Amino acid sequence: MYHNGMQLHLTRRSGMWHLLVSMGNNSTSVLLESSSSTRRRPRWSYIRRHNQVSILLLVGSNLQWLITIFPNMSQILCQTMPLHFTGCQDI
């Protein structure tokens, strides 16, 4: 996927999903934490740009990853969150 001058590509290595972000001559690989339980390729839920920051949401079978890319600082943050709560409450 190409977005605002960045090439975004999902790959699976050693049983874990990685997001490869290429910006010009710079490339960074971001490990999607706990993605070993996600066999299918995570889907792009949304990608937005706010000022100079790009925000991506990837959704797997039981987890989602919020990825914030700061191209001017060459910094990428990745937050892993459960997709939904499946527990039960005592009544």
UniProtKB/Swiss-Prot annotation:
The keyword Ribonucleoprotein does not apply. Pfam families: Bunya_NS-S. Signal peptide: none annotated. GO terms for biological process: symbiont-mediated suppression of host gene expression; viral process. GO terms for cellular component: host cell nucleolus. It is found in: Host nucleus, Host nucleolus. Keywords: Host gene expression shutoff by virus, Host nucleus, Host-virus interaction. Belongs to the orthobunyavirus NS-S protein family. Plays a role in the inhibition of the host immune response by interfering with the production of interferon in infected cells. Induces host nucleolar disorganization and host POLR2A/RPB1 degradation leading to host transcriptional shutoff. This is Non-structural protein NS-S. It comes from Bovine Schmallenberg virus (isolate Bovine/BH80/Germany/2011).
